[in-house]
Amino acid sequence: MLEFAISAPLDTGAELLSDQVSANFPWLSLSILFPIVGAFLVPFIPDEGEGKQVRWFALGIALVTFLITVAAYLYGYDPSLSGLQLSERVSWLPDLGLTWAVGADGISMPLILLTSFITALAVLAAWPVTFKPKLFFFLILAMDGGQIAVFAVQDMLLFFLAWELELLPVYLLLAIWGGKKRQYAATKFIIYTAGSSLFILLVALAMGFFGGGTPNFEYTNLAQQSFGTGFQLLCYAGLLIAFGVKLPIVPLHTWLPDAHGEATAPVHMLLAGILLKMGGYALMRFNAQLLPEAHAQFAPLLIVLGVVNIIYAALTSFAQRNLKRKIAYSSISHMGFVLIGIGSFSALGTSGAMLQMISHGLIGASLFFLVGATYDRTHTLQLEEMGGVGQKMRIMFALWTVCALASLALPGMSGFVSELMVFVGFATDEAYTLTFRIVIAGLAAIGVILTPIYLLSMLREIFFGKENDQLVSHTNLVDAEPREVYIISCLLVPIIGIGLYPRLMTDSYTASIQELVKRDDLALQRIKKPSALMIRNTTMTPAVVSSPRLPITQTRSEQLTRK
């Protein structure tokens, strides 16, 4: 039973929050506003040739947005610094504590680049869309700006607004362009995500108004507040539910297979490549960074939930006969490594979680794009209705094989590096007992073993075996076209590049991750040596080494012994 007594504050904010580096040019504001403005210009583009002009316009906006984020990284971001960079701050509604505050550090900058990169490829993947193309590309571009804002804003109320901004485009993309059960999938998505978002708003208001006076919702201010341990635990629990839906964490995951089961290929890429990463990013930014004492006590729970994700989703994926749902559960399984990395008090493990988000964003987008391309040819998602198409689609088979090998963490691919970092980081983390580390690592290894089994068997059922006569006679099994090869090639370049030389990515966020882990480690040390005002009994952290409990009462025999 937890006693929510208020503890003395963890006064580390001033030491660990480095000075902000102001932007020499409003790169981040431009990267947020440019695609949104472009989205509102889409309705004015002449609609001729089944939306051809609209496609080129949307692709141009997405590419320019990507170039803006690249320029921000090259000309305004220093990977060696751990603090906030590219900082922009404009007072908006000072009486309400609302400020337009954006910036980037190692936790957010790689994800900003990933967002703009995946979105540009998703626009190219949407080239065959001819039904209401103006509305489709309007939603894609608006979603681009909203997702970049999620990673760039430095104000918790702005974060909530950006978090909500991307919900409506996803809902409409599912409800209008989805499959037969699109209304069900879209409604389930909006209920899960919008309902859980209420916790973000409540926590933002509670933290912003903490201590009275003029509210302030900026991250740098919140990180230096004297939040008591009980208050942190309540906020942490609420945020864990909200972000756990988006990650997703089992059992808050059921919206994802339904959404993926009905989405089109470009929407698949945005869901798997970006949307899930918002949950992992938010856990790092808010739960781990702003609520360090609560994170130190919830961390073992995150690790257990991560193992549940890995094993449960891998077993469920193995049993799926629908191709989209199989890959969807595979995504849930891989995101379990993110939870384990965030729950570790190791810089290596947390860095591995960050790399796993980036790696899965690339690999997940590639796999789901191939699912869409395969469906366009076979017009079925049931594995038992496929088979024997490898001879007719050799290039497609080669693309599938490489991407599947990347997903099962083949050495030389980014997934291998990220999962290895999480494993080694957690296994060498002395914050947990040796028994706990062995059990968790052993259970997680089961998921690693299951992954190649269900992925390779999936390839066998799609491309090998006897040809389905009905499938061959009623479909046009043409091989991959240049556009499809180009999209997969663009995704494979960073996947293989990071796998061969991980520092291409890890150097961009190592300094920020080290600062984050240092802050959480100080909170952990404080829990190990609690003061009289701290929580007396924390049942959530049985695995933490040397977490002494305060003596509450003494028996008569103990008192006589001491005398």
Swiss-Prot record:
Catalysed transformations (reactions): a plastoquinone + NADH + (n+1) H(+)(in) = a plastoquinol + NAD(+) + n H(+)(out); a plastoquinone + NADPH + (n+1) H(+)(in) = a plastoquinol + NADP(+) + n H(+)(out)
Membrane topology: Multi-pass membrane protein
Keywords linked to the UniProt accession: Membrane, NAD, NADP, Plastoquinone, Quinone, Thylakoid, Translocase, Transmembrane, Transmembrane helix
Subcellular location: Cellular thylakoid membrane
Ranges that cross the membrane: 25-45, 56-76, 90-110, 111-131, 133-153, 157-177, 189-209, 230-250, 264-284, 298-318, 335-355, 356-376, 397-417, 438-458, 485-505
EC category: translocase
Molecular-function GO terms, alphabetical: NADH dehydrogenase (ubiquinone) activity; ubiquinone binding
GO cellular component: plasma membrane-derived thylakoid membrane
The EC number(s) this enzyme carries: 7.1.1.-
GO biological process: ATP synthesis coupled electron transport; electron transport coupled proton transport
Domain of life: Bacteria
Similarity comment: family membership: Belongs to the complex I subunit 4 family.
PANTHER family cross-referenced by the UniProt entry: NAD(P)H-QUINONE OXIDOREDUCTASE CHAIN 4, CHLOROPLASTIC, NADH-UBIQUINONE OXIDOREDUCTASE CHAIN 4
Function: NDH-1 shuttles electrons from NAD(P)H, via FMN and iron-sulfur (Fe-S) centers, to quinones in the respiratory chain. The immediate electron acceptor for the enzyme in this species is believed to be plastoquinone. Couples the redox reaction to proton translocation (for every two electrons transferred, four hydrogen ions are translocated across the cytoplasmic membrane), and thus conserves the redox energy in a proton gradient.
Protein name: NAD(P)H-quinone oxidoreductase chain 4
Organism: Prochlorococcus marinus (strain MIT 9313)
Lineage of producing organism: Bacteria, Bacillati, Cyanobacteriota, Cyanophyceae, Synechococcales
